[in-house]
Amino acid sequence: MNAHEVNFDGLVGPTHNYGGLSYGNVASQSNSQAVSNPKEAAKQGLAKMKALMEMGFKQGVLAPQARPDTAALRSLGFSGSDEEVIRRAAKEAMPLLAACSSASSMWTANAATVSPSADTADGRVHFTAANLNCKFHRSIEHPTTSRVLAAMFNDERHFAHHAALPAVSQFGDEGAANHTRFCKDYGDAGVEFFVFGRSAFDSRFPAPQRYPARQTLEACQAVARLHGLSEAGVVYAQQNPAVIDQGVFHNDVISVGNGEVLFHHEDAFLDTEKVLAELHDKLGRRGGRFRAICVPRDQVAVEDAVKSYLFNSQLLSKADGSMLLVVPEECRNNPRVWNYLDQLTGDDGPIREVKVFDLKQSMQNGGGPACLRLRVALQERELAAVNPGVIMSAGLYDTLVAWVDRHYRDRLSETDLADPQLLLECRTALDELTQILKLGSVYSFQLD
């Protein structure tokens, strides 16, 4: 049965700024208060989408959130008109305004966890929006995320949508950034790989000491139950707490998987041999041949992996059966990482090609190629049922670039967030975007 993996990339929102909001994310914190360029950021993301589409990969787009989020500010006690709410927040609690203005929804790997129909009990594609409860600025995303996903995948014969898990630390869920799937072919039953940082209820599991573990085992298990996954098709693994403390805040900063291949750092997991053996066994029972490519720490240190985002890459299957690794420019700028990649593609392994993209605006906030996309494996009939307005084409690319040129600023500092005009600019832009993408009314300001 013919099936495809479609990458739905997050469109960078008009309020893209460097607020330094993400404790545990080294790049985010180190670039705090820098001046951003939302127009450039959006165009860098669109250029990646267009390039992959032109290479023959299925590509979609996921709309950004409406920011500043005045409803969130009202819930924190700011009152008056929207303009008055923003002015008061800027005067009394600038960190809250910065949080409610974040464009972090661009990193759609955190939008949701997705299980394809070949894996689920009812034969539908399942989506669970991530609660992202570890960070306030991201915890306010999931209601809009759910509405946007429902507008994109709106045929309930093929798609099932679940609300985010309870917004408490015991069920901290960061979505697909801690989830990947292995399979022989995208339409075959596969093995879903959930990676957690700690257990909420079992003290036998170790935990990081410096930075928080954002994903719990219990959240992973809950999502697997919601999606109707069988035990034979699920593997749970704990991320190494030591690498979380080195800035590996999601598993997609230290490993990436696709098809039958896991590309990972030597220090990515606890009990690595046991984890790999279980993946090999379970994928083998489903007709696949699991293969792990381990990057030794003496060739690429964890620090280099974090700085370059080597593993926050896209691993894509080409038509000839080989794989392409999509990496950020920072990998080419790191001699140790680039030497490793040169060696990797020269070997007789599955990864034969590396493609480099300039994603500096996103990277400075701590998000590489993998952060920017949500993978959805779809059968032909399911792909035909997706809202066609969100599938990338040459025409849509041109339309979105023109839309960005009309509505986005090329400079945004923290003080600019206090400008009530920014709110009006963003709402005007997003109101137009929902028409371009044929989403209907998905934003709170459209529903009020």
Curated annotation (Swiss-Prot):
What GO molecular functions are on record for this protein? N-succinylarginine dihydrolase activity
**Domain of life assignment:** Bacteria
Q: Where is the active site?
A: E174, H250, C371
**Keywords associated with the record:** Arginine metabolism, Hydrolase
Pfam entry (one): AstB
Record field: catalytic activity: N(2)-succinyl-L-arginine + 2 H2O + 2 H(+) = N(2)-succinyl-L-ornithine + 2 NH4(+) + CO2
Pathway field of the UniProt record reads: Amino-acid degradation; L-arginine degradation via AST pathway; L-glutamate and succinate from L-arginine: step 2/5
InterPro entries attached here? Answer: AstB_sf (IPR037031), SuccinylArg_d-Hdrlase_AstB (IPR007079)
Which BP terms from GO are recorded? arginine catabolic process; arginine catabolic process to glutamate; arginine catabolic process to succinate
Q: What is its EC number?
A: 3.5.3.23
Q: Which residues bind substrate?
A: 19-28, 110, 137-138, 214, 252, 365
Q: Which HAMAP family match?
A: AstB
Q: In which family does this protein belong, per the annotation?
A: Belongs to the succinylarginine dihydrolase family.
Instruction: Describe its function.
Output: Catalyzes the hydrolysis of N(2)-succinylarginine into N(2)-succinylornithine, ammonia and CO(2).
Quaternary structure (record): Homodimer.
Task: From the Swiss-Prot or TrEMBL record, give the protein name.
Answer: N-succinylarginine dihydrolase
Q: Which organism is it from?
A: Pseudomonas aeruginosa (strain ATCC 15692 / DSM 22644 / CIP 104116 / JCM 14847 / LMG 12228 / 1C / PRS 101 / PAO1)
